[in-house]
Amino acid sequence: MATKEQMEKVKDIVVKLRYLECMDNIIYYDRWNNCPKDGFDYEGKVGAYLTELSNEKLTSKETKELVESLEGETAFDSDTDKGMVRYLIGKYKEAVQIPASLQGELNQANADGQLAWGKCYEADDFESFKPVLKKQFDLQEKIATAINPDEKPYQVLVNRFDKDYRLEEIDAILAKIKDAVCEILNAVREEQSKIDDSILECEADHDTVLRIVKKAQEILRLDKDKSTLFEIHHPVCVCTGPRDSRPSTNCDELIHAILAVVHETGHGLYNYNANDEVAESGLWGGIEGAMHESQSRFYENHVGRTREFWENLYPYLQKEVPKYKEISLDTFLAALNKVKPGLIRLKADELTNTLHIIIRYEIEKEYFDGKLTVDTIEEAWNRKYQEYLGFTPKNHQEGILQDVHWASGCVGYFQGYALGDAYAAQFAHKLLADCPDAFEKLGKGDSSVIGNWLKEHIHQYGQTYSAREMLKKATGEELNTGYYIEYLKEKYLH
């Protein structure tokens, strides 16, 4: 049994590690939001120093002795205590395995990469981005080798985000989903092509878009005292404390801005909704990877694309954008949910989104298996887009430069979106079993049934459990992709 004294020490270390992470996330937020270009380099150095401080804490004699005394322990007073120990052991092992100099180099590369990506994207210049990409991938491979030299580098990188899965499992899950998506796509492509989605295009000024996306957040009951909205080309959500989560959107296109803010609000709600015990223990913020993406994808698709959600938002949209007064809600929803294969992941329809994810996962895997280089990666990208979606990018912006992930160090992350879709469908199935009137109430303006169910069964626990444990605790089952496939069939074939 872990002693009270041991757990007090664990809590002290974990909480202080989260302080440092919080400061690093504030820098990350600033780089997205306010930092002038000439400030990026210095902020990168500050971030590297915070990593150094974190490593010093993790590799100290005190932490080493504490971890050694608790490793293998199975008896704890609470699940929160067990979660803190698991968290600390995981962080300790990485700190011991990865030299501080290498981690600092990666932090600087992430800052530099984010800035370089922005410049190269604006210039549509992949050639200048190649050295940045190669440096990132080289550093990621060094990180993977440092963590486990006996494992495939890509397996290690994927497990930094989705710790519960072997590549073989992910391959099988994605293959099953891909087959189902392609089958549905082939069945509906012709009929869906007849839907006029040009109505989604509209001239709306910046302030109008901002008012509408804030109204969407209001419907979802995002707490203004625990969040703030910022604007960015590539929407993200930054968690800077247990009661401080900062979703974003891109206000260039109205409907895209709404869906993006609903997606990021899902992250935001998960980030700040840990219960007090979990928050005070340093386990706030949610489980990264697929579990976090399940919450954003749940809100984007299972809420944000539904009639019930738009019964609340559409009248406001019609008031702010007069053209929609002439368009029925039925017509609007058909356009919103139209299956329309395309090149841009962030603008993908719900059905084909997974194909975008699979392309990225396959490319990462092939690169780290030695089958691709930075000189051949774009050709592979374009070939897969033509094969899976029927389009070849005409430029780099709508092709390989569209995502910021690789530039900012998120390598091995993409499978989390697809797994997150499967998790989200499983959560939706259980939510409806527990609360059959949840969406009826949403249609009447009350999203609290949905929000409270997610908080009670998932959000309040933060990082207390692993993703697989959390899924089983919330739904009573292991991952069952059948729920996701049936959801897609019900939506598009019936």
Predicted regions: what is each one?
Residues 2-163, 489-493:
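A well-structured
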Residues 2-6, 22-25, 38, 59, ...:
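C-terminal, non-catalytic "cap/extension" segments appended to globular domains
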Residues 107-256:
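Contiguous, non-catalytic segments that form substrate-binding/exosite surfaces or channel walls
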Residues 174, 178, 206-210, 216-230, ...:
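All-alpha helical catalytic cores of prenyl diphosphate-utilizing isoprenoid enzymes
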Residues 225, 277-281, 305-315, 374-375, ...:
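Acidic/polar loop patches that form or flank catalytic/metal-binding clefts of enzymes
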Residues 253-275, 293-297:
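Active-site recognition of the HExxH zinc-binding catalytic motif
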Residues 285-326:
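Post-HExxH zinc-binding segment in Zn-dependent metallohydrolases
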